[in-house]
């Protein structure tokens, strides 16, 4: 919360959560239960973040993973391919090497700033 108060962002972008579906023919096991518990924890965290945004008067958006990845032109068919693609895009854009999570955060921010960010115009007062 202190980072929000100190930085006073115009917008906070949150990646949407998704419940991994059970595979057909697979019985419910500890992996499925773990996935459900993770989903519930992320849903609660998302709610807390949204409530903080509302309390502080900060705009927020919840971004679908597929939507921000498509906007950033992420390539790949598997999860790991898409993660690596986003890392390479960040390297291309900013010439920095980042982790998968950092690359995803940059991609979400890139998407949100272009789609929802305030459009600032420069006024030439000398004219």
Protein language model annotation of sequence segments:
Residues 1-127:
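Phosphate- and other anionic-substrate recognition elements at nucleic-acid/protein interfaces
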């Amino acid at each position: 919360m202190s980072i929000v108060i100190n930085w006073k962002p115009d917008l906070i972008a949150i990646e949407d959560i998704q419940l991994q579906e059970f595979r057909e023919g697979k019985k419910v096991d500890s992996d499925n239960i773990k996935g459900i518990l993770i989903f519930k924890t992320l849903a609660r965290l998302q709610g807390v973040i949204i409530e903080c945004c509302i309390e502080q008067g900060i705009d927020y958006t919840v971004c679908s993973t597929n939507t921000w990845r498509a906007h950033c032109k992420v390539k790949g068919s598997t999860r790991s391919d898409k993660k690596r693609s986003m890392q390479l895009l960040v390297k291309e854009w900013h010439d920095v090497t980042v982790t998968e999570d950092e690359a995803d955060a940059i991609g979400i921010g890139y998407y949100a700033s272009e789609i929802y960010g305030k459009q600032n115009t420069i006024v030439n007062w000398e004219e």
